[in-house]
Amino acid sequence: MPLNLNKKHKELKTTFNPFWSAAVVNEKNGLKNLKKAWGIIFKVLKVAIFIFLTIVGLWGCTQTLAQPWTGTNQLLGSGLEIGYNFGTTGDYRYDLQSNNVGPYFTFSDYTLAYGPFYGWFVWPASQIVLPIMYATRVPLGSGPELGFNMILSLIVLLFLVRLITIVITLNSTLALEKMNEVQGKLAEINAKYKGALDLQSKRNRQMEIMSLYKKHNIKSSASFVQVFVTLPIFLIIYRIVTTLRPIKAIILFNFWDLSKVPLTEIFSNFTSTGWTFIIFLIIVLPVQFISQKLPQIWASKRNENAKAHSQKSIEQLNKTKRMQLIFYFVFAVITAFSAAGVGVYWFLNALFTLLQSYLTHLFIVKRRTRRRLTYSKLEQMLERE
């Protein structure tokens, strides 16, 4: 009975205002056009940001080859250094001064003289690390600087970076989750056109896959977005770790000189300090590997009840694993051949990755549980009716 009253009420309302339907249609069309316009603007803006980040990344990679002052130098007081003007603090670890060995370039105030990459990105990020390190330092003459101030400053910087990029990384993870959820339907489409070599069948298969992705709001490019963002961030922090004067002056835990290159020390000064860097690599490299492996294990647990994967998706999964192994090998080489401060950054970054991946895992599991409860409640309501 209430349903009939509602229908009558709607009919009376429509009869009373004959222009109501047209107004609603116009309003919906206006909202649709506005949404479409915002979508186009957002896509253009996103493409512009990706192009900008790509240029920044390439600039950061090639600048060392083009300009002599961008080459990092392990010696304190050599190469390009970021710190305070000479005489500002009275602490040789923070005040910029040359050791008169080789070329020396100071970066104590904002300038674009060293290029936009340093001026726009490296300098602002260094002004987060440098004040924290100075405020939490062990004063000269009060004991050895064990490096806790550097660890604290890098944790703050990494936290801010993760806070900025969490939307991107979360979207990338959720996109992969959606891809896993539709693997069963994707396998059905591939099985449907298995052995079909004609052009029309290939087009139909591609259209059905695109329709499936669109239905579930899956963007195949989402997994690559993180790479575009990660590379410039790595280059920025790499430059900070290798050019910030107080980091070059630290002997971490009175054990590892962060200005030294692990592999060089192992082969040239093994009996004195080189052997300690073997321990350094044994600590840093496995943590980096675990930070890549554990998220895969968590993802497998989340999707262990999923339908069978298609042959193509299995090949894609194996390809992703191979790429991750290549990336890990590259990171291991960079850690071994760069100043030890870079290894400390990788270690802390790996811990952040593990924490963020675990929180994302919990978020996805909780969201799935909530969805299941919602679906079960709807089914119960339908059964009662």
Curated annotation (Swiss-Prot):
Annotated keywords: Cell membrane, Chaperone, Membrane, Protein transport, Transmembrane, Transmembrane helix, Transport
Transmembrane segments: 38-58, 112-132, 150-170, 224-244, 247-267, 270-290, 325-345, 346-366
Keyword Ribosomal protein belongs to the record: no
GO biological process per UniProt: protein insertion into membrane; protein transport
Pfam families assigned to the protein according to its UniProt record, in alphabetical order: 60KD_IMP (PF02096)
Major site of localization recorded for this protein: membrane
Location relative to the cell: Cell membrane
InterPro entries: YidC/ALB3/OXA1/COX18 (IPR001708), YidC/Oxa/ALB_C (IPR028055), YidC_ALB_C (IPR047196)
Annotated signal peptide: none
Protein topology in the membrane: Multi-pass membrane protein
Keyword Transport carried by entry: yes
GO CC annotation: plasma membrane
MF-aspect GO terms: membrane insertase activity
PANTHER family: CYTOCHROME C OXIDASE ASSEMBLY PROTEIN COX18, MITOCHONDRIAL, OXA1
Family from the record: Belongs to the OXA1/ALB3/YidC family. Type 1 subfamily.
Subunit structure: Interacts with the Sec translocase complex via SecD. Specifically interacts with transmembrane segments of nascent integral membrane proteins during membrane integration.
Role description: Required for the insertion and/or proper folding and/or complex formation of integral membrane proteins into the membrane. Involved in integration of membrane proteins that insert both dependently and independently of the Sec translocase complex, as well as at least some lipoproteins. Aids folding of multispanning membrane proteins.
Protein name: Membrane protein insertase YidC
Organism for this UniProt entry: Mycoplasma pneumoniae (strain ATCC 29342 / M129 / Subtype 1) (Mycoplasmoides pneumoniae)
Gene giving rise to this polypeptide: yidC
